[in-house]
Amino acid sequence: AVITGACERDVQCGGGTCCAVSLI
């Protein structure tokens, strides 16, 4: 997971789906 200002795609969410919006 990377800190971004948008929806992040990560395998931790289940197959690289847009699952969370990171807050800096």
Curated annotation (Swiss-Prot):
Disulfide bonds join C7-C19. It holds the Pfam family Prokineticin. The keyword Magnesium does not apply. One of its GO terms (cellular component) is extracellular region. It comes from the Eukaryota. The keyword Acetylation does not apply. Expressed by the skin glands. GO terms for biological process: defense response; positive regulation of insulin secretion. Keywords: Amphibian defense peptide, Disulfide bond, Secreted. It is found in: Secreted. Stimulates insulin secretion by BRIN-BD11 cells in vitro. Belongs to the AVIT (prokineticin) family. This is Prokineticin 1-like protein. It comes from Pelophylax saharicus (Sahara frog).
